[in-house]
Amino acid sequence: MRVLMIIPAYNEEESIFDTVTSILNYRKKVDFDLDYVVINDGSTDMTKQILEENHFNAVHLVMNLGIGGAVQTGYKYALAHDYDVAVQFDGDGQHDIESLSDLLEPIRKNEADLVIGSRFVGDVKSEFQTTFMRRFGIGVISNLIKWTTGQRVLDTTSGYRLADKVVIKQFARRYPIKYPEPETIVHILKRKYKVVEKPANMFERTGGVSSITPIKSIRYMLEVCSSILIAAFMRESE
């Protein structure tokens, strides 16, 4: 099985070296082929220089496309290079590479097409737990997804996700620009693909500063809910 880690990075000079190094160390002890590609999303700091100086595999976008455009670039790369599984893995050091093998199991067993690394399932809590307000917002989004698709997904905003070949093809063709995680869950469930949540450990970000503010959180909630409703009820070609 060939697995590709897609690492979107925008101004991650403080964390990108450690993020890639963690993958390089981890792949020495797994029984599948593990590759990676960093999608440098038009960074204006030293991210590009760090990637080039260390000869890390990367695609350098000439302008900032945002998280959706960067991740879709990674899925197009995975499709073009015929990977069996693509893994979204944040460049800021929040995702724990040690969770990967467990997350991969449902795809290996043909039990899932999309696996979501979740902070909210299982007996062992993730080292990083988000704020009450964000958990409340995630709960609202979860209820809306349940209402529109019939399936409960708890960690609707997790960026730690694994896609099999059929979902890679879907995401390479169509991927939302602004709020990709909740909207793509609806998109995949509408097409009767199997979505599974598995426990995943996550850390506090190791570098940079989160841009989330209370005002942005409220706007995010309104826009995400709108995008979910549009995705749920619009007709699209396969």
What residues fall within each predicted segment?
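Short loop->beta transition adjacent to catalytic acidic/histidine clusters or analogous donor-positioning motifs
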Residues: R2-V3, L24-V37, M46
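Donor nucleotide-sugar binding loop of glycosyltransferases
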Residues: E12-S15, S43, D96
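Catalytic metal- and UDP-sugar-binding loop of GT-A-like glycosyltransferases, i.e.
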Residues: L61, F89-G91
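Hydrophobic helical membrane-anchoring modules
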Residues: M1-V3, N143, T148-G150, R173-E238
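Acceptor/aglycone-binding surface of glycosyltransferases and processive sugar-polymer synthases
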Residues: M63, I67-A80, V85, I97-K178, ...
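Short beta-strand/loop segment that forms part of the nucleotide-sugar
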Residues: I7, V20, F32-G42, F89
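A conserved acidic beta->alpha catalytic loop
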Residues: N40-K48, G93
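Short, well-formed alpha-helical segments that are part of the catalytic scaffolds
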Residues: E12-R27
